[in-house]
Amino acid sequence: MLHTLHRSPWLTDFAALLRLLSEGDELLLLQDGVTAAVDGNRYLESLRNAPIKVYALNEDLIARGLTGRISNDIISIDYTDFVRLTVKHSSQMAW
């Protein structure tokens, strides 16, 4: 399943998101959700421990001035890769 987080993790039921993640799921951080990728924040450690791949939309990182501040554990992708993820996953959950 593809999970997309478009809101700030501080304004989301992040605990529920983590509970619903399953091994093999993928999470795309976009819009204000990319703030979860910033090194040193409390949400990043939870994502590192989850059995998933985590991506962040590069355009949203640039728009928020975060490109140099994200963790190396987060995979930065463009819109083409975003489309590939949506095609890959028949089911999706937006947060």
Curated annotation (Swiss-Prot):
It is found in: Cytoplasm. InterPro entries: DsrEFH-like, Sulphur_relay_TusB, Sulphur_relay_TusB/DsrH. Gene3D superfamilies: DsrEFH-like. Its main location: cytoplasm. Keywords: Cytoplasm, tRNA processing. GO terms for cellular component: sulfurtransferase complex. It comes from the Bacteria. Pfam families: DsrH (PF04077). One of its GO terms (biological process) is tRNA wobble position uridine thiolation. HAMAP family: Thiourid_synth_B. Heterohexamer, formed by a dimer of trimers. The hexameric TusBCD complex contains 2 copies each of TusB, TusC and TusD. The TusBCD complex interacts with TusE. Belongs to the DsrH/TusB family. This is Protein TusB.
